[in-house]
A protein has these predicted regions:
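A SIS-like phosphosugar-recognition module
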Residues: 163-164, 175-177, 183-184, 202-246, ...
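Conserved short alpha-helical segments that host acidic/polar catalytic motifs at enzyme active sites
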Residues: 1-244, 248-249, 257-292, 330, ...
Length: 606
């Protein structure tokens, strides 16, 4: 998730911007840059890599002091990390920094090329700044309104115009942006930590707002161009709390960012109601020729692959296999030229997963990577890439990255099914619309925190528990169990519910918790029967099911009911309460939620 800072006032804008960007480093970034107003125009300085590289460049340049500028730390979404792809992006008249994704940037770029504009980078932001430039005729607000009316997507923008050297224009749509109030100076930022060294007074831009910031004051306009007032707030957070957005832990913050991550990942890949992979080389003709899909990952990514396997086989009727990367690379897998290997990794640097990718390529099998980090080793090595736009994930236990890995796998499964004629256009559009709606479907689950917290308090002293489920629910059992044990240190195992009688049931004794997932209608009665078996042996059964499901008396100790949703997409809703349950168990047990013992965010060794 990119970081934005803007400053106008009597101080050195360069220093204020660097201070602010440093406080946003926790968001993750691969490059940084600033734009500073000068007597002869706007000077842009940017650099790939750490903020220290940008500092060094600025020290070498020794620019005249400027009292107005904008800065940016970039998390790549379009174009690999590089100086040319870094922000700010500029024309001789306009400079901008941007957080968000412009969904229709390709079509806009073609129109701008037809008007004579040229492009140096691969980014959607360069398209945006040149679109604004094309609409600029001396009045910045009119230019911004005209340009943004043509844009589809999300953005938080800070904009400089050469003709207005003492003014920052800020615009917000579906990406967070605030302004800070000072004395004879004012600020723009994507998050509060960037401001706290200089001010604690701020206002939050509402959807569609534009703010005009000068040293003397800030004016607000709504999406219709009407002058409005925005409430002045006072931040009473310390720096650590500010970085977490007011949440006690990054993990809880990231769980609550899942709706936005779903929208950012899915929306740009839907056109005319149909899923689009946005990979020109991976044509429908190639999809029709795929033999077997091999899904490979480690830990949570492998669990996402299990959901993907079930979706691919259910929707596209294509054989699919799931492998743990460390097993795949050493078991001499049978791979055929017509197969496709899908590599799943949040970081794009996972050692075993990268080795599995290299093995597949050495056998002449095409590789599609699903990763969250643009320009990562896996992204560079794969034949095709689909990025998950989760933004940086700070907590070691993956939550929002897993969520959008599922979304990308569903998009792939739907396109594969459509290309192969297994789904009609009508049915494909139905599933795609349901997937787009997922961000709204999960919001009530995020609001159920108190119920989940209460249940966690009832199970907090548990030493061992079991998860059971069938089909998609089994895949979710594995992930729910992993989340619980990795952050709360409660021993937990997950089993296919039908396997209980094949040994596992011998471990069920009085008071042992069994978390039963029963959201799939075609196997609901069988899963309930399995849960009842454990209950009859003294287990405490926590049942997750849907609102319309009939739960026989005596089956469950507690029941969590989910909204009705398509069975195939139900994992998107079910995972949220499972993540929250693990989170609150860890909190109540006094565990280090964001940094569990012995674990690393990216495993780059075997």
């Amino acid at each position: 998730m990119c970081g934005i800072v803007g400053y106008v006032g009597m101080r050195s804008a360069q220093q204020v911007l660097l201070d602010g960007l440093e406080k946003l480093e926790y968001r993750g970034y691969d490059s940084a840059g600033v734009a500073l107003t000068q007597r002869d125009g706007i000077r842009v300085v940017k650099s790939k890599g750490r903020l220290s590289a940008l500092r060094s460049k600025l020290e070498e340049l020794a620019l005249p002091q400027s009292g107005c500028g904008i800065g940016h730390t970039r998390w790549a979404t379009h174009g690999e990390p590089s100086d040319v792809n870094s922000h700010p992006h500029s024309t001789p008249r306009v400079s901008i920094v941007h957080n968000g994704i412009i969904e229709n940037y390709g079509a806009l770029k073609e129109r701008l090329i037809a008007k004579g504009y040229t492009f140096a980078s691969e980014t959607d932001t360069e398209v945006l700044v040149k679109l604004i430039d094309s609409c600029y005729h001396g009045e910045p607000l009119q230019a911004l309104q005209a340009a943004l009316a043509k844009v589809r997507g999300s953005y938080a923008l800070a904009v400089l115009f050469k003709d207005y050297p003492d003014t920052i224009f800020a615009v917000k749509r579906e990406s967070p942006l605030i302004v800070g109030w000072g004395e004879g100076e004012n600020f723009v930022a994507s998050d509060i930590p960037a401001l706290l060294k200089y001010t604690r007074r701020y206002s939050v831009l509402e959807e569609g707002d534009m703010a005009v910031c000068t040293a003397q004051g800030i004016r607000f306009y709504n999406e219709f161009g009407e002058a409005v007032e925005r409430e002045k707030l006072t931040a009473d957070w310390d720096m650590e709390a500010a970085e977490k957005g007011g949440y006690p832990h990054f993990m809880l913050k990231e769980i609550n960012e899942e709706p936005a991550a779903i929208t950012a990942t899915v929306s740009p890949r839907v056109e005319n109601g149909l899923p689009e992979l946005r990979i020109p080389e991976l044509t429908d003709e190639m999809l029709r020729s795929i033999g077997t899909v091999h899904l490979v990952g480690c830990g949570t990514a492998m669990h996402a692959g299990m959901v993907g396997k079930t979706a691919i086989e259910a929707l596209a009727r294509v054989p699919a296999q799931v492998d743990i990367a460390s097993e795949f690379r050493y078991r001499d897998p049978i791979l055929k030229p017509e197969d496709l290997v899908i590599i799943i990794s949040q970081s794009g640097e996972t050692s075993d997963t990268l080795a599995a990718l290299k093995l597949a390529k050495s056998r002449g099998v095409p590789v599609l990577a699903i990763v969250n980090v643009v320009g990562s080793s896996i992204a560079r090595a794969a034949d095709y890439v689909m990025y998950t736009y989760a933004g940086p994930e700070i907590a070691v236990a993956s939550t929002k990255a897993y969520m959008v890995q599922l979304c990308v796998l569903y998009l792939f499964a739907l396109r594969l099914a459509y290309a192969r004629g297994q789904l009609t256009e009508e049915k494909t559009k139905y599933y795609t619309a349901q997937l787009l709606h997922a961000s709204e479907v999960i919001k009530p689950r995020l609001a159920d925190c108190e119920q989940i917290k209460y249940l966690a308090s009832r199970y907090v002293n548990t030493q061992s528990c079991f998860f059971i489920g069938r089909g998609f629910d089994y895949a979710l059992s594995l992930e729910g169990s992993l989340k619980l044990k990795e952050i709360s240190y409660v021993h937990s195992d997950a089993y296919a519910a039908g396997e209980l009688k094949h040994g596992t049931i011998s471990l069920i004794t009085d008071g042992v918790p069994v978390i039963a997932l029963a959201t799939q209608k075609n196997v609901y009665e069988k899963t309930i029967s399995n849960a009842k078996e454990t209950r009859s042996r003294g287990a405490r059964v926590l049942l997750f099911t849907t609102k319309d499901a009939e739960v026989p008396e005596g089956v469950a100790t507690e029941v969590i009911r989910l909204d009705e949703y398509d069975d195939i997409l139900m994992p998107l809703q079910l995972i949220v309460p499972l993540q929250l349950f693990a989170y609150y168990m860890a909190v109540l047990r006094g565990c280090d939620v964001d940094k569990p013992r012995n674990l690393a965010k990216s495993v780059t060794v075997e």
